[in-house]
Amino acid sequence: MDQNPPPVEAAKIQNTNLVPTRVRWHVVTLLAIMAGLTYIDRLNLGIAGKYVQEEFKFDSQTMGWIFGAFSLGYAVFHLPGGWLADRFGSRRVLTGAILCFSIFTAVTAIAPSLPVLGSLGAAWSFAIVRFVMGLGEAAAIPVGNKMMAYWLGEKERAFGTSIFLAGVGAGGVAAPVLVGWTIRHWGWRACFLLLGAAGTVLGALIYKYVTNHPEEHPGVNAAELASIRSSSKIGPTPNQSVVVNKVPWIKVFSSPSMWGLMISHFCLIYPVYIFVTWFFIYLVRVRGVAIPKASLWTSAPFIANLFMVPLWGWLSDRAAERLGKRRGRRATVWLGVACSAGLLWSGSHTENNTFAIAQLAAAGGLNFAASSVLWTTCNDIAAKYSGSISGLMTTFGSLGGWLSPILTAAIATRFGWTYALDFAALVTLVSGFAWFLIKADQAID
């Protein structure tokens, strides 16, 4: 069970005259790599989608539903995944989640040829496999975020969480290059098989090295533990008993802050999934960009993410110190969504490809950056059961990710891509208004 940290020996608490070890940052690094791999696995079909669509003769609407299947599975299992982490331990649940999404990433390569799935048709085969893959990935980010609550003190938490989520940006940068190169040399199926193998190795590393709590890790010395616990609301006392953190669901669902987080995340993830699913195809078919250049340009929103997410984590911490958590977190999100919405609108109306793609990429990076503040706020308002809270918030966000490729295809087919991106800009602004419901300085319990 992922309980409060176990009792700490008195000697380990008192002997803090050592140079602190940095195991917590090794854990954050592994979790950031995991976050990056999840996004490579999500983006691979968006990049390989052109080839899949041509081979199996899928129209845009069918492809939109296949893209959406992943997000639907992702939405369905976020809350159970977070609850399982709270109940049975982050390490076990995270390892199982990584193995699940890695295995089904590999299965994507052969889905239509499997006896059971093949009988349903190619479209259903891909959709089912992507749905199950989404189930596996659903637990990964909320469980990783829960680990942040235990492994980092409050003063480091926003920055550490931003590094963790910047792994998403690194994965987004790597995906078009790695997947594009693999497809050109070995075909689209190879990218799924290789990524499945990489995920299996990463799952084994995390199971071996990462623990639920820093107290359990043999490499953490007393000074590092004191640094973590000195600013943590969930740190132990020497004689603390071990109790299960039961989630007060009635308080959670009656909390305006929780509803604000869910609505805001839904609206932030909607435009993000345009970049995850349709951006490569948009560049090739609408903007007329050559495939090799499109592979590189597809990385642009995630390059922006790589720099903007840590910056927004730092800004969020500084704003919270100066303005208080409620006003500081809200101001940081509003800065991101206002700029993102403006750039989405401007980019969709710009004819020059270089300027247009640069604006759209910056908009995508700002959406990622603003969303990182939401994860920190989950720990602000409910650190003891942040796995469940993060899972609930991300369930709503994933519904935005499910709707995004389907509705975007429908709007683009009927009215054109300019309107599809303008609508995404409007949705982004709504995410900012949801923050008037959120009180980051008040715990739910």
Q: What name fits each language-model region?
A:
Residues R326-V373:
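C-terminal transmembrane helical hairpin of 12-TM major facilitator-type secondary transporters
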Residues L99-S119, A338-E351:
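C-terminal ends and interior cores of transmembrane alpha-helices
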Residues V129-V168:
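Cytoplasmic helix-loop-helix junction between adjacent transmembrane helices
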Residues D2-M34, I40-L43:
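Cytosolic juxtamembrane N-terminal segment immediately preceding the first transmembrane helix
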Residues L45-I47, F253-P310, S371, W375, ...:
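Extracytoplasmic gate region of multi-pass secondary transporters
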Residues G68-W83, S299-W312:
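Central cavity-lining transmembrane alpha-helices of secondary-active solute carriers
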Residues V168-H217:
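Helix-loop-helix hairpin linking two adjacent transmembrane segments in secondary transporters
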